[in-house]
Curated annotation (Swiss-Prot):
<feature type="propeptide" description="Leader sequence">
    <location>
        <begin position="1"/>
        <end position="5"/>
    </location>
</feature>
<keyword id="KW-0472">Membrane</keyword>
<keyword id="KW-0812">Transmembrane</keyword>
<dbReference type="Pfam" id="PF07963">
    <property type="entry name" value="N_methyl"/>
</dbReference>
<dbReference type="GO" id="GO:0015628">
    <property type="term" value="P:protein secretion by the type II secretion system"/>
</dbReference>
<dbReference type="GO" id="GO:0015627">
    <property type="term" value="C:type II protein secretion system complex"/>
</dbReference>
<keyword id="KW-1133">Transmembrane helix</keyword>
<dbReference type="InterPro" id="IPR010052">
    <property type="entry name" value="T2SS_protein-GspI"/>
</dbReference>
<keyword id="KW-0488">Methylation</keyword>
<keyword id="KW-0997">Cell inner membrane</keyword>
<keyword id="KW-0653">Protein transport</keyword>
<dbReference type="InterPro" id="IPR045584">
    <property type="entry name" value="Pilin-like"/>
</dbReference>
<comment type="subunit">
    <text>Type II secretion is composed of four main components: the outer membrane complex, the inner membrane complex, the cytoplasmic secretion ATPase and the periplasm-spanning pseudopilus. Interacts with core component OutG.</text>
</comment>
<comment type="similarity">
    <text>Belongs to the GSP I family.</text>
</comment>
<dbReference type="InterPro" id="IPR012902">
    <property type="entry name" value="N_methyl_site"/>
</dbReference>
<dbReference type="Pfam" id="PF02501">
    <property type="entry name" value="T2SSI"/>
</dbReference>
<feature type="modified residue" description="N-methylmethionine">
    <location>
        <position position="6"/>
    </location>
</feature>
Length: 125
């Protein structure tokens, strides 16, 4: 007699294989969603850092050598930034370091950005 269909064991093995494949797809999707959230957070932090540096340039502020901190409401969240001026070999030029954190107490910054500023009123050579 010829067998038609699948045995119960074959059906159960097939179900296990499909279940494992489904879990793998679900896990990958969850990781991608988490990664997108982190990417969005890092992008916002970089925008805030760029905004702080642009504000210093527009206001023609000379960056202080100690950390100056503040906070800003951005994209519906409270963010914490701090800026420090760092001396360079040329006394008319300072490096500006900006760190941005979503959590004030976080040891690691969400974004760190460095740029350089020529002292206001001094011609660059």
């Amino acid at each position: 007699m010829k067998q038609q269909g699948m045995t119960l064991l074959e059906v159960m093995v097939a179900l296990v294989i499909f279940a494992l494949a489904g879990l793998t797809v679900l896990k990958t999707t969850a990781q991608q969603a988490n990664g997108l959230g982190r990417l969005e957070e890092k992008t916002f932090a970089l925008w805030i850092a760029e905004n702080q540096q642009a504000a210093m340039r527009l206001e023609k502020q000379w960056p202080q050598s100690q950390w100056v901190d503040g906070e800003v409401n951005f994209a519906g969240s409270l963010w914490f930034w701090r800026i420090q001026g760092i001396a360079t070999a040329d006394t008319r030029v300072r490096a500006i370091d900006v760190e941005v954190r979503h959590d004030r107490d976080s040891r690691a910054a969400d974004a760190v950005l460095r740029s350089y500023l020529v002292q206001p009123g001094e011609p660059a050579q």
